[in-house]
């Protein structure tokens, strides 16, 4: 059906490349390539908006401090006033498995610093930034605070967290539910075969640790997928199952596999891409000397490639009769499940 060509023949990435940062639970860079021209901006902007606004998380909704009637008070022996304490409470990062609202309490005597790690939580609430300072107590000072924790999405201002029947002394807190703290993306040109006119989308994601960055992106993509389904007003025709005739090849079908599927280091992969080596068939015909003449390609990259090829029963310097075939892209798709 011709209409199917609208989406079936568009180029799309084989997989998402995830490079964890110093803390894999909080930082990562994700790369998707190749994408059709313009899709980098389209997908990057949409994912960024959903990541920052629509993912579920947990946060403090309100706090009650013993002896305090409102947020414009001060507490004897506590160096910070209540307004500053509330601002610090807003920065507490939480992970909660079940539904809210739930309570957690902190009680401490001075002298010393009250941190988020001092909070007594119930079983399914985890404080993700225990070193966060909430307030400082002088000698003889004491403080007790009770927090209300709930789940939600995005940002909710303190005014919306004040219930109509709020008791005296309940102080609402701005709630930042989103587990995603920062998202940035950039779009660059990339190559697919001989064509340079494709997009490469690179996203840098930072979370509070409640979700890993790649899980956060996965949930954001699922939200977009679900929202876009309403615009699809047709049923996809079922594919007729036919017995495909696999042609005989003069070479190993594994040569039709692309080198970017070999999970090489970034340096080695970039060297191959810059030398226009797309398929394994292109690679195995090269000699070691030819590879070492490739710009920025050193002995370490050579050994890495030799090891990967050896695991496939291949090596550099092979003779490949009939390579490259005229219909190489078509053959690569047909043999995708056979090598």
Curated annotation (Swiss-Prot):
Its EC number is 2.7.7.6. GO terms for biological process: DNA-templated transcription. One of its GO terms (cellular component) is DNA-directed RNA polymerase complex. Keywords: DNA-directed RNA polymerase, Nucleotidyltransferase, Transcription, Transferase. Disulfide bonds: none annotated. Pfam families: RNA_pol_A_bac, RNA_pol_A_CTD, RNA_pol_L. It is an enzyme of class 2 (transferase). Residues 1-235 are annotated as: Alpha N-terminal domain (alpha-NTD). CDD domains: RNAP_alpha_NTD. One of its GO terms (molecular function) is DNA binding. It comes from the Bacteria. The N-terminal domain is essential for RNAP assembly and basal transcription, whereas the C-terminal domain is involved in interaction with transcriptional regulators and with upstream promoter elements. Belongs to the RNA polymerase alpha chain family. Homodimer. The RNAP catalytic core consists of 2 alpha, 1 beta, 1 beta' and 1 omega subunit. When a sigma factor is associated with the core the holoenzyme is formed, which can initiate transcription. DNA-dependent RNA polymerase catalyzes the transcription of DNA into RNA using the four ribonucleoside triphosphates as substrates. This is DNA-directed RNA polymerase subunit alpha. It comes from Rhodopseudomonas palustris (strain BisB5).
């Amino acid at each position: 059906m011709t209409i199917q060509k609208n989406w079936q023949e568009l180029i799309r990435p084989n997989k998402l490349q995830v490079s964890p940062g110093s803390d894999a639970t909080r930082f990562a860079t994700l790369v998707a390539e190749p994408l059709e021209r313009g899709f980098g901006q389209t997908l990057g902007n949409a994912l960024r908006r959903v990541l920052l606004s629509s993912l579920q998380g947990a946060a403090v909704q309100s706090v009650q401090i013993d002896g305090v009637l409102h947020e414009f008070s001060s507490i004897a022996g506590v160096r910070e006033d209540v307004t500053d304490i509330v601002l610090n409470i807003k920065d507490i990062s939480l992970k909660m498995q079940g539904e809210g609202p739930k309570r957690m309490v902190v009680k401490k005597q001075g002298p010393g610093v009250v941190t988020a790690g001092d909070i007594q939580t119930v079983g399914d609430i985890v404080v993700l930034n225990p070193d966060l300072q909430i307030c400082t107590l002088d000698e003889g000072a004491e403080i007790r605070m009770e927090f209300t924790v709930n789940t939600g999405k995005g940002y909710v201002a303190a005014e919306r967290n004040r219930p109509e029947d709020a008791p005296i002394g309940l102080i609402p807190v701005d709630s930042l539910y989103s587990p995603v703290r920062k998202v940035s993306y950039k779009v660059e040109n990339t190559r697919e075969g001989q064509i340079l006119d494709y997009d490469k989308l690179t996203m840098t994601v930072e979370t509070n640790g409640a979700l890993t960055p790649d899980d956060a992106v996965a949930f954001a993509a699922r939200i977009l997928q679900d929202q876009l389904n309403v615009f699809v007003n047709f049923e996809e025709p079922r594919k007729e199952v036919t017995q495909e005739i696999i042609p005989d090849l003069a070479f190993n079908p594994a040569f039709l596999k692309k080198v970017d599927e070999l999970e090489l280091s970034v340096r080695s992969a970039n060297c191959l891409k810059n030398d226009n080596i797309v398929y394994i068939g292109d690679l195995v015909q090269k000699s070691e000397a030819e590879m070492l003449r490739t710009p920025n390609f050193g002995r370490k990259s050579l050994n890495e490639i030799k090891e990967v090829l050896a695991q496939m029963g291949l090596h550099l310097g092979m003779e490949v009769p009939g390579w490259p075939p005229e219909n190489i892209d078509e053959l690569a798709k047909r043999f995708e499940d056979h090598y």
